[in-house]
């Protein structure tokens, strides 16, 4: 392998935290072929992206392989505010504020390298986003008091060791170095002391708040694959939960002018997950993959932020708590790959994601319900290089969630 090309790929991996991100929370778009097959790509031959989809399958790589992937994601959506206080007895006079999100596209970048050490051992490393999102709404909309800008940049670096025990069994274990960079903005009302000639009064002040910080944390993964015969194979992948202790900067900009700052701190646990996959080869040209992913989103039970060392004492609360109480969810995917020749192939896929966000735990940070993803792709390869392209369309279902309980409103 060209050492300069490898150095370029590792540099791209280090830059990934700055560019990875898409609306949503979990990212599955780790390669063009993976996108084309709906994420059901756990048993690909000679594919360095197996580091991400199924580390045990890096034993299918012959020699030394490197791969880079760039997926462009462009989310579009709309919402409506419902005021329950305006319902009549027939429930047919709902007053709503229809509007939409600001399109905030992002890139999911992946870089992978796999090397066969000998007939039994392989080493691989990948840098790709497992969790990321960007959502933005108009600053003057009614959504802005919930969140008008939310961004989670994320990347995982996963050094992996794999061993092939025999013709049937392969297994892998790896570490995960996970980075997250978080930024949240919303409009908020705060209680502030105001001096008058007679006394000091507490006034309600409108302002914009911003929380920005980053964190690194460690996790691990393990995988195993078993081939029944030349045509049928199963695999399982486990990825551990990762706990981030996030130190951040808090800023508030009152409408009247000025700035209030404070130190912010929060703990967030990213969920662990299980992938179960099945691969069937109809013949030497066509194969089908099935995949089910269980993500334990119940670890995201709250987003609680503590504030300390404010620049203006007595204004900010010591804690800003937000219950989430997400439920565990499943993602199901099916992918088909057909090789027309030794050089050309086509792929198609479908995936269904369950909704995990409850009515009283939704927000405009991740305003998405169940998802259906339809995708197609094509690939060209020769003995030294592979080029693939894919196109996916995600149909995101409606998510209804609570607005401000004291006002009795809600969003959809």
Please provide the spans of the model-predicted regions:
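Outer-membrane beta-barrel pore proteins
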Residues: 42-44, 51-64, 113-119
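Outer-membrane beta-barrel porins/channels
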Residues: 23-34, 42, 86-88, 92-93, ...
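Surface-exposed strand-loop-strand hairpins of Gram-negative outer-membrane beta-barrel proteins
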Residues: 39-46, 75-104
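Gram-negative bacterial Sec-dependent N-terminal signal peptides
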Residues: 1-22
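Short active-site-adjacent helix-start/loop capping segments
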Residues: 59-60, 74-80, 115, 131-136
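Transmembrane beta-strand segments of Gram-negative outer membrane beta-barrel proteins
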Residues: 26-41, 59-78
